[in-house]
């Protein structure tokens, strides 16, 4: 949520952040300084955190803390990025948010994540209602969980569900399906030590550009 919010502020958008964090969260003052508005964010539990193991830019996540869920959201904006981490947004709240906004950009990772007996995070195939979603950002594993397919076949399934723009990320390869055309770019061959936050930054930049340029 912080990565999305800060990126949107850099792009000169007003931001209202709906999230939960505990008393251990160190960036409250910084968010206020950046004029990011948030209310009822303080949780009785510690901030959701993961232990991250990196192997050649591949991530293994282990759940360390789980914050309180978000109980309710009243939107006062036409556009929203929905980007849960782990189990903080219920299906009912997800439906409400979608119906209250005209432009919805979804990063579904938090709806797909599960935890095993060792607290290791894994993804599970999930029947998520994607109606009223304008754009979605997924990686190959998330695409497989949502559609049962990968690559172009999976993207087309999402398109048939009514999503206008589908962004597929695969390490340095990024593809966008929009209006029956697929656009692809390959990022420079850089050594990646930690990719945390890249997806959030990309989502926010894409969403803000769509709102500003309508394209």
Locate each region found by the language model.
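Short catalytic helix/loop segments, enriched in acidic residues and glycine
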Residues: 1-9
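Short, conserved phosphate/pyrophosphate- and ester-handling motifs at nucleotide-, phospho-/glycolipid
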Residues: 8, 139, 199
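Short beta-strand scaffold segments in enzyme catalytic cores
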Residues: 6, 50-52, 174-177
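Short, charged, surface-exposed secondary-structure boundary motifs
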Residues: 48-51, 113-118, 192-200
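Conserved N-terminal subdomain of the carbohydrate kinase-like
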Residues: 9-105
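Conserved phosphate/ATP/ADP-binding segment of small-molecule kinases
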Residues: 112-184
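Short, small-residue alpha-helix embedded
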Residues: 192-215
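Phosphate-handling active-site elements
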Residues: 14-16, 182, 209-215
